[in-house]
Amino acid sequence: MRNIIYKAEDVVDSLSTLRKEGVKKGAWTGFDSLFDKYSVKKGSTTYIYAGAHQGKSQFGFELMMNLSEYSGWKWAVYTPETGSPTEVFAELLWVYLRKPFLINDHLTATDEETEKAISFINDHFYIIDSGLQDLSVEGFYTAVDQIEAENFITIDGCMIDPF
């Protein structure tokens, strides 16, 4: 069992290092105006809180995409309110393309851009979808372990929206 209780003497060497070197910033979020105040470190937790329909999910998608593009992060995503896995991937494609994924009468991604985007999304995002069944936090992280084992990768970040 791993240790979850510490005394200062248990971490005196790392305290000394921290004292000398200071706190290191995490990965760049892709937002210049945000980076002065916020960065993301692997293993840390971020909670995005606001009222209904304020863009929390979209902001989370933007953060995930930027961390994938600029730092190579791989993600496990559970976001049942966004829709089916197809609909979640479509949202991620829209974020990656920075223009509409769906074909419409206005500006839209080309087939070539879409193929490149699908390849990128496929390499960096794994959607966990329990259908109409409940999914516990433990069940989510069991699925993350399964993703890592079956794909021989490490998931760098998880998005659970909402839980």
List PLM regions with ranges:
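Short glycine-centered, acidic/aromatic-flanked micro-motifs in structured strand/loop junctions
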Residues: 50, 129, 162
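Cytosolic-facing regulatory segments adjacent to core modules
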Residues: 32-36, 70-154
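Helical hairpin unit composed of two closely spaced alpha helices linked by a short loop
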Residues: 156-163
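The Walker A/P-loop phosphate-binding site
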Residues: 2-99
